[in-house]
Each structure stands twice: as structure tokens, then as C-alpha cells.
Amino acid sequence: MTTWPATTEYAGSSAHLTELLAAIAAGQQDALAQLYHLTRTAVYGLSLSYLKNTHDAQDITQDVFVHVWDHAPQYRPTGSPMGWLLTVCRNLCLMRLRRTERHAVLSEAEWDAIPQQETGLTTEERTLLQHVLSRLGEEERRIVLLHAVTGLKHREIAALLELPLPTVLSKYHRAIRKMRADLEGDNAHDK
């Protein structure tokens, strides 16, 4: 059994993820477990942003890693391994949405179902984050979450969402301004 070194980066370095995908392609199940451990939060976060339902997001997260196991030999290390993983996730989410044609808003109970240790936020911070994110448009929210949660660069987000880079940049900066204004407004009310 191969042991993989732990990484201090959130989802692992690109080189480390590429090594894991190569090991998965060679049939090493422990590499899949390591990849899952390093990337599950980002994959789950993206699926939740598309599906707005914790049960469906959990299903898709599981499906992503089954897909990775089945298709790792097809991964070409010329691109970002995290980008490939999130593209798989996005495609599975879009297929699910086409099947169910469901675009619901994430309920408070579903926000509460996200494990607190996964986010590292207190209940109060999670509530505030939920409020601020709910005021953003769908695409703005997805771009902010992809950048903040997965650490993807804006050009990677543009490729993943199939949007022009200037559009991603403007939507990201607009979303940050909206969030800042909301937070400053909340702080003004507290004083």
C-alpha cells in the first residue's frame, strides 16, 4: 500500500493531484481515498451550488469519484487536475439538472446540514455567509465559491464555466463589492 504525503495546501498541489490521478489510473485505491480527502469539499461545494440540495450534491460528489476511478487513465496531465475534477462535477450536475429540471433555493436546513468542521466557520459566521451569498446572482455566487473554496484561478473558472475571462473577472469583482456593501451595512446596524 502506497502512502501519499500530506499537503498543507487546501486541495493539494497540482503536481500532487496529478500523481494521485496517475496512481488511480494504475488501480491504487488508496490514491483515490487520498484524492477524495483532499478534494471532497471543493467537489461537494460546486455540486451544491448547482443542485441546491444536499442529498443530490452528496450523490453527485460520490458519482464524481466513481467517474474518476473509471476514467483516470483518460486524464491528460497537460491541464489542471482540479479543473478536470470540477469539470467532471459540473457536467454531472448539469446532466442531473436536465433530468430533474429543478432550480430550488438552498434551504436553511440544507445549509445547516453542511458539517461545520468542513467549513471552519462558526454558526454565526455561516449564517452571515449564507445571507451575503443569497444576495448574489447565481453566476456571481458560483464564481465566488469556486475561487474561495477551490482556489481556482479566474482563468480556470472561465474555462470551467465556459465564460470569457473578462466576464468572470467583472462578475467576481461585482460580487465582492456587493458582499462588502452587505457586510458593511450589517456592521453599521450593529453599532
Per-region residue spans from a language model:
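Arg/Lys-rich amphipathic alpha helix in sigma70-family domain 2
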Residues: 70-77, 86-107
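C-terminal edge and immediately downstream basic/flexible tail or linker adjoining helix-turn-helix-like DNA-binding
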Residues: 1-12, 23, 109, 122, ...
